[in-house]
Amino acid sequence: MATPQLSPGVLTREVDLTVGRAENVLDNIGAIAGPFEIGPIDEPTDITTETQLINTFGKPISTDAQYQYWMTAASFLTYGGVLKVVRTDDDDLVNANGNRSHETVVTDLKIKSYDDYVANYAGVGQTFGYAAKTPGTWANNLKVCVIDNAADQVLGIGTTSGVSVGMGVSVSLTNQVIAGSGDTSSFTGHLKGIITGLGATTIDVKITQRVTTAGVSTDITYAQGDQARSILAGNNVSVINSSEVGVATAKIEGGNYAKDWYDEQTMGLTNSTVYWKSISPRPDTSNWAADRSSKNDGIHVVVVDDLGDVTGIQGNILEKNLNLSKAKDAVSSENAPQKIFYKDYLSIYSEYVYAGDDPSDGSDGFKAASDFSSGYTAITAASGGWNRNAQGITFNVIGNDTYTLTAGADYSATGGYTATLGNLITSYNLFKNKDEIAVDYLLMGPGLGDKAASQSKAGRLISIAGERKDCMATISPHRADVVDLSLIHI
């Protein structure tokens, strides 16, 4: 019988040393700070590839030799490992942002990071509509296209003299067949709606109720082409004010018309015509809101590179954020427990923008359209405002709107990329506590404009390495001392 013993008392055994070994032990951890094109401010971010470096912090730029910082980072990554990158702050850095109807933008808005947004900009009362995710000129001229379910139909009525947003519309129905669940019924009374938008010869209408001759109201939702739920050709339309007095009438015939509102909506782009219906069906009341006796919370937010300044492709649709909600507590019915409140969703999932002010409250000077309440009285901005939990709320509507982001600025008013010594030191100080952040190599990158500043930068990195006692500082000489020197013959 075979035996593993080669000699008395000596036992040989094969051991797989891969079992129980330490996995994913990180080494070769670098750290660098610099004036990068994009990215969060003063927040260390782990980067492992050059592609990730470009996607997170932008490409190398020749202005002010910014590429020297980028090349230092990229060179380190070629050896593997992890590079912790910090984008340095500057007084001139500003996030591109936009308000409704191209009103004055905020020229000093600086949202440094997601944490900064949550702490200081996610609440009510903001002065910007939408803002770029990070500071810089990179987002200038991006467009944020927004649409909700502001109207069901657009009616061409010839003239809108004496008509205003918030008034009601009424269409008489006689012996109208109503489809039910397995049966039909006959209805006599009138179809009722509210005016949510106004043109020179057109009104935008949202269908809200059917009212019997006895005054019994039933809430309904619009259905295109259904006489029991929409206004059709041949109907006589009456416009009613809040005192329930008729102020105008029109028959949908001849030059007058009734069209589906959403089918007519296009994005506010300069270089292309894109219909919203080609992007997604109309945003509707979410299941979350409907289950809580609320409505009109649905909203789409789409980011477009209209001029091609960001991607080089005019009209490039960068991202579609669809079927979001105006309700602060809204949760997706398809991906629970994912939050779909538009501010929360964009802050987490959008690569390009944050949302700021509630655009339905009229605080930006743009007329706030309202939805239907009772009788022919429009809901006030206060009672239908966004940013509240969905419980018995008929959310205000804004319709189809476009925000153009402008006023973004880099490290100088003229688009420079020079970081100051003080701001660089602030960024490198984020690496000084070895108990909070692991670092093996502190990368200085290039020196600064004068020799004393270059020496000060190097000195601080050496000091941090000395305080930590677990890493090395890699130092660069002052550029003027080693580059373009004339030969000296002795």
Whereabouts are the PLM-identified features?
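Surface-exposed assembly/interface segments
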Residues: M1-I488
